[in-house]
Amino acid sequence: MNWKYFTVTLALSGVAIALPAKADQLDTIMSAKTLRCATYADVPPFSSPDPKTREMVGFDVDLCKAIANELGVKAEIKPISVEARVPEVKLGRVDITVANLAYTLSRAEQIQFSDPYYVAKEMLIVPADDTGKKKADFEGKRLASTKGSTSELAIKLNKSDPLTFQDTGSAYLAVQQGKARGLVANTMTTTLLVNESKTKGKQMRMIDEPMLLEPVGIGMQKDQPALTAKINAVLHKLDDAGEINKIWEKWLGPNTEYKMTRNEKVVPISELKFDPIP
């Protein structure tokens, strides 16, 4: 026998045996009887402290609790910053991130996304007397947004000229003062501003065609196929039962200040027609 070969082989085998396999996160969740959910620390109506109880409340909080209930475990809400949404789940400090997390190519390289449960939109609002009807009508035109935002990216992708500000209020004021032809922001913000303009300032209207589509899903660690499959199955079940719509109506629906309607169904991201954000 070649003892040198045997010794090296045995040593290598020992190294291989010593390396732990990646733990099955779904098994860990079920054993701990706890689903650790990362949500926004203070971004209503998604997740923010209740002024009276100081408990976290909002759309994302209720969705996390609904998922945990389907799994038969307790939901543990962990408030985090906007910037921590991807790192927290990537590093395994939480099991899932439920924080209005839009799909982007860079995020998808780091974490696993569930099937989207709604599609966020970057929308354009303009003065009511503006003749533009679709986003192509605003190519080369100056549009306002917050600096470094998805809204600014949407303007650039439309080949329009971005005029950016540190906050939405300043960007909106620029449109009211005629310094920009329109404002690009998310659906909630633009809806609020259009409603506000009915009684204050220059009346605005929304262009029907979205400037950009952003599928929103749940973030998980990569290489956890059992957890991914289970979360997707739960989302589809909640959607089919009308539970996601109930949560939506409570926090974002027509009877709230946001007056938003959810028309989407939970579907694989591959079935959506959209241009992924880098």
What residue ranges belong to the model's regions?
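Periplasmic-binding protein-like
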Residues: 41, 119-126, 195-235, 254-278
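Beta->alpha turn/N-cap motifs
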Residues: 38-43, 78-83, 92, 96-104, ...
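Extracytoplasmic small-molecule ligand-binding "clamshell" domains
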Residues: 24-100, 109
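Short helix-initiation/N-cap motifs at beta->coil->alpha
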Residues: 61, 76-87, 147-148, 163-177, ...
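Extended ligand-binding regions for polar small-molecule ligands
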Residues: 61-70, 137, 141-142, 149, ...
